Amino acid sequence: MKSTLMTASLLILVLLSIIDYASVYAEFIDSEISLERQWINACFNVCMKISSDKKYCKYLCGKS
């Protein structure tokens, strides 16, 4: 009984740490995507001020 309880407790701790890691990793991915979008928008805005060629700026900055 005691070993079953210890095993269950250990399993719960492992699962909680996996869930915690997954949530931190998901936040990291969201922030990476947000930074990428900000960079693309900034690149596009600067390019448009310089060249005014929308098609070229979309190609240059990777904006779809």
From Swiss-Prot:
Subcellular location: Secreted
Any one Gene Ontology molecular-function term assigned to this protein's record: toxin activity
Tissue-level expression: Expressed by the venom gland.
Keyword terms, alphabetized: Disulfide bond, Ion channel impairing toxin, Neurotoxin, Potassium channel impairing toxin, Secreted, Signal, Toxin, Voltage-gated potassium channel impairing toxin
Cellular component GO terms held in the UniProt record: extracellular region
Superkingdom in the source lineage: Eukaryota
Propeptide: 27-36
Main location: secreted
Keyword Nucleotide-binding: no
Task of the protein: Potassium channel inhibitor (Kv).
Entry similarity comment: Belongs to the short scorpion toxin superfamily. Potassium channel inhibitor kappa-KTx family. Kappa-KTx 3 subfamily.
Protein name, per record: Potassium channel toxin kappa-KTx 3.4
Annotated organism of origin: Heterometrus petersii (Asian forest scorpion)
